[in-house]
UniProtKB/Swiss-Prot annotation:
The gene is HIPP24. It comes from the Eukaryota. It comes from Arabidopsis thaliana. The modification Cysteine methyl ester is found at C147. Residues 148-150 form a propeptide. A lipid is attached at C147 (S-farnesyl cysteine). SUPFAM superfamilies: HMA, heavy metal-associated domain. The lineage of its organism: Eukaryota, Viridiplantae, Streptophyta, Embryophyta, Tracheophyta. GO terms for molecular function: metal ion binding. Interacts with ZHD11/HB29. This is Heavy metal-associated isoprenylated plant protein 24. Coiled coil: none annotated. It holds the Pfam family HMA. PROSITE patterns: HMA_1, HMA_2. A metal cation binds at C37, C40. Belongs to the HIPP family.
Length: 150
């Protein structure tokens, strides 16, 4: 095993070493219930700014929305926010222009901010519009004597 063998061994070790992937810059929006005073706002800001990778924390008291930006994992941000003993969930609203059918019942929410609707999967609209064929065939205008209720 000469110099070439040693060089190949070292190059194989360097290739096999796993490199950590850099996290993408993300924005996580949270809905935090009962942000009533400046103390609550300060507490949430302090806890979330302590999460590793956080660049900025914005709190909107009126909408009860917290926006966290940075190289972060949304699950870790959610866990840290829950440590404040407040009810926390991911921001459930999107602009109504981003939803395929914003007027279905699952998307409608009275508490939603203006021009926002609740996030719903695309399959929800299909479930509402499907009609059972047996009901449409039951009363046929082509044959009035074929009433299927009897």
């Amino acid at each position: 095993m000469g110099v070439e063998g040693t060089m190949e061994y070292i190059s194989d070790l360097l290739k096999k070493r796993k490199r950590k992937k850099k996290k993408q810059m993300q924005t996580v929006a949270l809905r935090v219930a009962r942000i009533d005073c400046e103390g609550c706002e300060r507490k949430i800001k302090h806890v979330l700014s302590g999460v590793k990778g956080v660049k900025s924390v914005d709190v909107d008291v009126k909408l009860q929305k917290v926006t966290v930006t940075g190289y972060i994992d949304p699950k870790k941000v959610l866990e840290a926010a829950k440590s404040t003993k407040k009810k926390v969930e991911l921001w459930p609203y999107v602009p109504y222009t981003m939803v395929a059918n914003p007027y279905i019942s699952q998307a409608y929410d009275k508490k939603a901010p203006p021009n926002m609707v609740r996030k719903v999967p695309d399959t929800a609209s299909v479930n509402e519009t499907t009609v059972d064929d047996s009901y449409t065939i039951m009363f046929s205008d082509e044959n009035p004597n074929s009433c299927a209720i009897m």
